[in-house]
Amino acid sequence: MTEETGNDFQMVQGYEIVPSNEEAHAEEVQGDELVLAEDLAQGDEVQVNGLVSAEMSTPPTSRRRRKKSLVWEHFTIEAVSGGATRACCKLCKQTFAYSSGSKIAGTSHLKRHITLGSCPIIKNQEHKLALTPAVGTDNDGEGTVERPSKRRYRYTGYANAAFDQDRSCSYLAKMIILHDYPLHIVQQPAFTTFIDSLQPRFRVVDVETMEGEVYAVYQKEKENLMQAFSTMPGRISLTIGLWTTSQTLGYVSLAGQFIDSEWKIHRRMLNFMMVSSPHSENALSEAISTSLSDWNMKDKLFTITLDNDCSSHDIYSANLRDYLSNKNNLMLKGQLFVVRCYAHILNAVAQDVIASIHGVIYNIRESIKFIKASPSREEKFAEIALQLEIPSTKTLCLDVTTQWNTTYLMLLAALDYKQAFSTLETSDDNYNEAPSAEDWKKVEAACNYLKLLYDSAHSIMAAANPTSNLFFHEAWKLQLELSNATGHEDPVFSSIAKDMHERFDKYWKDCNLVLAIAVVMDPRFKMKLVEFSYSKIYGVEAAKYVKVVDDAVHELYKEYVAQPLPLTPAYVEQGDGNNAPASENGTQATAPSTGDGLVDFDMYLSEIATSQPTKSELEQYLDESLTPRIQEFDILNWWKLNTLKFPTLSRMARDILAIPMSMVSSGNSIFSAGTGTRMLDDYRSSLRPEIVEALVCAKDWLQYLPATPEAPSTTLVKVDAP
């Protein structure tokens, strides 16, 4: 009910008559700029906890009624051309249609602008809304009195979301997991004070309880991952990493890489298990077997990838192959089972190069330290470089000893300034670290070969999620370059090349088969690149090595043919309903005659189909012309589109392309892999093994989830406002 009195009027709101003048309005918002969703009017419907209720009606009156919806506290009416009017938001000044002639648009769209956070001003100031009833003051400002409760409707966005202790604890656990915070952060006074300032009702738990929260997050995410694995269409390949601690214990990390039904490649941490002797043969085999049992994937293991940390790699390989072949159905009799990490071999070869000239590198480091010791020395060195007309724009800087790429860049820059170093030594009695001419030749040779490794590493890092086919291109070129470099006429160059080739050649012999099979699954190259590259590497003996690859591809394909072909919904939906069904030998079965008098002709076609040999999917794939090479070629999408054409071969391609040729995951530096023993810090070493595993695994899993939690409900709920 309203009574018009000059510019003042009163409005029935719930059970209370609220004055509409400025003083009353200021009291209603209690110092905040906004009151959200207080837009009830006569006959307006409001959703309350999912239900729709109507505001009580007022008796009819003969007098012209003023606009009573509380929407008009936030909007003004502005006339526009054509006799129409528009509602203008007082906060953001955005206008909305209101009336045109005798037609009135209503206020529902205006309510949505206010209540659903569409107004940018409301959205930015939503955090100002109090969660708890405010305490007001009397008119004189003396003392405090509790204002009478008023029934009103408020927007239930983040600011008014109901507090949930359990949910908040779970988010805190996820924060600790994702950011590697120590569990005892919950005991730190500054943290508890900060949390209390945000939400006084939140009870900060102790360390033991937080361990339980972390483990609960781990268990929940593990269940989700296990469910995903249960529908995984292909096999899984593992990467194995060894960790040590300051104690006598060690850990084994196991990550799985696979391609899902949408032909997207994924890598997920599976286990981070404590073992008493991680470098022992049996301990590693048992850890892998335990992990496979834990994840119900004993029959889905395809390959494992190990680092190159040690001379015991061959022992590991043989032991793992023997141990797991008795428990799992290994493809191709285990010939592809153990793969060596490409990133680790690159780094191992690079470290050999650096070690071969460590004396020269020491002098260059000391020289750079001398120059960088004071601005005057830097200026003097710059003047010398200018006088010598050295065109280089490279900056001298020290390397990071654990990242060989920085050492390479340091040597490359120093090589440009070699004359400046010599001149500085003759002009400054305090400097006597300049490398000799023979030293610079060693640096030149080292940079020449480090560039091969550097470029190869960058080619791999350029791919966000590199599939196995990419690695053959890098490996065969590097094998050829190093093999040719061993015959360099300069003994300095040939000496370094021989050491590099000796190490890389072993990797090539161990892994060229799996590398070659992977590139055969690339429709741009197939067997052709294998034939070409082997002719460069092996010369007249190339045919023998090409045959090994060809035989292995055909034998592996036969093993997939022997397996049942799953009839997935994708096959049914994508298949051409007009095609005749295929017979068991791969020929197209002929549909029976429909009374057209050609029964004998049908029999003739059937005899031809059974008597003539048909091509297998593999032979058809290899015989087809190569797919054009384009820069942005997506091999996984190609196989996805050709799954119906090659149903069996595509299953084989899925497993092969998912082999992790490198243990370095996307986003991590390839240049520091394998440069030292991975050590678990003292803090994590002090935790219980199951908590360590929960922290490591859950961190990996959580990074693939949406960054923000699901927004609270945006319904209107009735609350008692202060």
Swiss-Prot record:
Give the subcellular location: Nucleus
Transcription among keywords: yes
Could you tell me the Gene Ontology terms of the biological process aspect for this record? post-embryonic development
Residue intervals of every BED-type zinc finger in the record: 66-134
Region annotation HATC (Hobo-Ac-Tam3) domain: residue ranges? Answer: 617-702
Question: Cellular component per GO?
Answer: nucleus
Which residues of the sequence carry a binding annotation for Zn(2+)?
A: 89, 92, 113, 127
Q: Which UniProt keywords apply?
A: DNA-binding, Metal-binding, Nucleus, Transcription, Transcription regulation, Zinc, Zinc-finger
List the InterPro entries hit by this protein, alphabetically. hAT-like_transposase_RNase-H (IPR025525), HATC_C_dom (IPR008906), RNaseH-like_sf (IPR012337), Znf_BED (IPR003656), ZnF_BED_domain_contain (IPR052035), Znf_C2H2_sf (IPR036236)
Q: Specify the superkingdom.
A: Eukaryota
Among Pfam families, the record links this protein to:
Dimer_Tnp_hAT, hAT-like_RNase-H
Positions with biased composition (Polar residues): 576-592
* Gene disruption: observed consequences: Reduced plant size and amount of seeds.
Region span, Disordered: 572-592
GO MF entries:
DNA binding; protein dimerization activity; zinc ion binding
Q: What does this protein do?
A: Transposase-like protein that is essential for plant growth and development. May regulate global gene expression by recruiting other cellular factors.
The record's subunit annotation is:
Homodimer.
What is this protein called in UniProt? Zinc finger BED domain-containing protein RICESLEEPER 2
Species this chain originates from: Oryza sativa subsp. japonica
